[in-house]
Every structure is written in structure tokens, then in C-alpha cells.
Amino acid sequence: MMRRIHHVGIVVKRLTDAYAFYRDVLGLPLLREAEVADQGVRAALLAAGESEVELLEPLGAATPVGRFLARRGEGLHHLCFETPDVAASLTDLHARGVPVLDTQPRAGLAGRIGFLHPSACSGVLVELATPTASHGEEPSPLRLKRLVIGSEDVRATAGIFQSLFGFTEVAMNGGSRKMLAVGRGTLLVVPAREVGGIAGMVALSFVAEDFLALTAALRRAGIPRLDGTGEVTVEPAASHGVYLHISRYMFP
């Protein structure tokens, strides 16, 4: 059973530069920062409602995250689900023939963690984590609303996440999209043709506790954006490669 989206990982060139946007402009509280030597990163977790945002700075160009940065630039890297027993989850998935990168959990910034191979989840790199300590939800001006995933076969991709992790489908008004509930957040699987042909993680959506205060902060900082009545879209150049939507409302 997956309890929630624990975090979404974002590769950045420098943590200090990313803090200037995610912590100082958006107001996401910094929970912890540490060097994770076996992953070749310096990482930080910031609170976003029941979920978190993980920023990943490579320690060198030859590390996996360093190669990702050189190949793709800054942007979305992985998706992490919280499970009550990461060892049991990895064992179960491995026994079912699911490709995994870790058959046993190891230490990570999120607790005891393990990764599945991207081929297991339609090209999305998925991490499973069991936090080593229970933390209450940190107050934050933004809550993670959903992660958007592009797919050439929406039904198949949604079915994989349902089969592997037991997520339930959220009813939508027809169409070719599929939405899955994960804790209080959602995954939205959309046709790749609707998102520039991108297959994999495409965009993050947050809901603001005080939408007017948030838009004022973006305006003061001179952040390039598209303002709407109930949503603001931040240009990826300002949000370290992430298509970022911030809404006034939790639904739809």
C-alpha cells in the first residue's frame, strides 16, 4: 500500500539557486539538506502539504544525476511514494517480475529507500520510501496537487500504476485522460501529443493557501509567468526546468 506521494525529485544545477525560487519566492519550508554520497548528490527536501519537493544537485559530472543534468538539463527526475515497509514492497514487486534497481532498501534523504527501473512504470523513475521517523505535516503556503505524466498509451500507463501500487481512478468527464488518487494528491496521465510529445513526467501542479499572496510574491520577484483567474503558470526557465502550475482551488 502506498500512503502518499512522498516527494517529487527535481534536478538542479545548484541548490542555492533553486532555494531562491522554491524556498524564498514560493515559500516552501526547508525540512533538511544533506549529502547522499552513494547517489552522488547533495539533496534537500522542502515541504509542500502532505508531500515534499526534493532538490538534487549533482556532486560531479560523472554521477548519474550529473549525467542526467548534462543530457536533459534541469527538471523533473523522479517520483517517490511512501510505503509502510519498503523492504516488503521491493520484495513483492521483484517477485512479481517488476524490474527494480534495488532489491534491498538503502539509506536516503527520505528514509529507507529503493528505486524501480524506469521501464517498470512507462519510463517514470519511481522511488519507494519508508521514513525512519514520523514527521507531522509542516505548514506550507503550497500543497502538491498533482503530477502530470505524458504517455503514448494513457490507459496502459494508468493501468500499470494501478496494478503495481493499488491506486484508484478518480472520475473525470470522459476524454482521453486518466487521473489516479495517491493520498490527497493525484497523478494525471495525459496523451503525449497534448504535451509536446513528451512521454514521462511533464508538469507539477500546486494549490496555494493564499493565491493572491502567492501571485504577489511572483510579481515582486519578477518571475516570468502566465496569469489566469484561478491559476498561474510559471515558465520552466524560472522554475529550474519544471512546468509549474499553481492554482487557487484544489479541484478539479
Ranges and model annotations:
Residues M1-G9, L15-A47, E54-E57:
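An N-terminus-focused feature that recognizes amino-terminal "leader" regions
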Residues M1-Y19, L76-T83, A129-A158, M201-L204, ...:
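N-terminal beta-strand motif that seeds the catalytic metal site of vicinal oxygen chelate
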Residues A18-R23, L93, T157-Q162, L218:
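Conserved active-site tyrosine of GNAT-family acetyltransferases
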Residues L45-E50, A62-L79, A87-A110, H117-A120:
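Active-site-adjacent scaffolding segments
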Residues E54-P58, C80-P84, D92, R96, ...:
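A structural feature that tracks compact, well-ordered secondary-structure segments
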Residues L90-R143, M179-V182, T186-L188, T215-P252:
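Vicinal oxygen chelate
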Residues S140-V189:
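A mid-sequence, solvent-exposed acidic-amphipathic segment
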Residues M172-T215:
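Intrinsically disordered, low-complexity segments enriched in Gly and acidic/Ser/Thr residues
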